[in-house]
């Protein structure tokens, strides 16, 4: 199968996968979410004692490729040299981004987590990154390393740039409308999909809400 050559990301539903929690059932949930319209998958840098990192990443790439969905690596950029993954998500600004891009040797998607720090937004703009993500907008057990982000911060970032903005942390279909006025383009979620009885329905619901925002 050919690699995805479309190294862009525009918004939508962005699934963050915890590799330490993957089971056979997890892959089925991911497949159902892909069928319902994921825009990207990120492999979170939470490996615990797992050593077969490249194998897991490539399995996810193989799962996502038929749907044209890119797979991004959180922090462990070396895995892009061992797999067909499509990009990197940084937790913090890197002084070595130009060297990393050169070492990988192909077009990649790059994104970064922002908290309440507009300097990180400016860094993403200066480095011509493809998207930014704000964490955490609501309380979340999986985003407990993030500070809570004020809606005004996201709105300020929207005024600074047109690159896609995602929000993460405790987002559900019920509370997503509360943060839509900030101008975000997508949501990054873990448990809302991975712990759902019907991940396809959850993905569809998120996409429907985001699409309604675009038409208003």
Model-assigned labels for residue ranges:
Residues 1-95, 102-130, 156, 162-163, ...:
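Conserved N-terminal beta1-alpha1 strand-loop-helix module at the mouth
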Residues 78, 152, 188:
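Active-site phosphate/pyrophosphate-handling residues
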Residues 92-98, 137-160:
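Flexible, gly/pro- and Lys/Arg-enriched active-site loops
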Residues 113, 137, 143, 171-172, ...:
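Gly/Ser/Thr-rich beta-alpha loop segments that engage phosphate groups in nucleotides
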Residues 130, 142, 164, 186-187:
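Preference for short coil/turn "hinge" residues that link or interrupt alpha-helices
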Residues 137-138, 185, 192-193:
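Flexible glycine-rich beta->alpha loop in the catalytic core of nucleotide-sugar glycosyltransferases
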């Amino acid at each position: 199968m050919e690699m995805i050559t479309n190294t862009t990301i525009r918004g939508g539903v962005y699934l963050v996968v915890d590799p330490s929690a993957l089971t056979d059932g997890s892959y089925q949930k991911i497949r159902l979410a892909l069928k319902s319209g994921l825009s990207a998958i990120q492999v979170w840098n939470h490996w615990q004692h797992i050593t077969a990192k490249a194998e897991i990443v490539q399995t996810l790439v193989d799962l996502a490729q038929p749907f044209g969905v890119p797979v991004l690596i959180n922090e462990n950029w070396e895995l892009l040299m061992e797999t067909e993954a499509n990009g990197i998500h940084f937790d913090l600004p890197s002084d070595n981004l130009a060297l990393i891009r050169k070492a990988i040797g192909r077009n990649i998607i790059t994104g970064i987590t922002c908290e309440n720090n507009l300097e990180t937004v400016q860094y993403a703009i200066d480095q011509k990154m493809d998207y930014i993500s704000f964490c955490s907008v609501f309380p979340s057990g999986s985003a407990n390393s993030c500070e809570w982000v004020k809606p005004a911060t996201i709105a300020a970032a929207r005024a600074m740039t047109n690159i896609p903005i995602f929000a993460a942390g405790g987002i559900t279909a019920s509370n997503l409308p509360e943060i839509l006025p900030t101008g975000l383009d997508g949501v990054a979620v873990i448990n809302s999909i991975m712990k759902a009885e019907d991940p396809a329905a959850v993905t569809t619901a998120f996409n429907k809400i985001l699409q309604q925002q675009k038409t208003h």
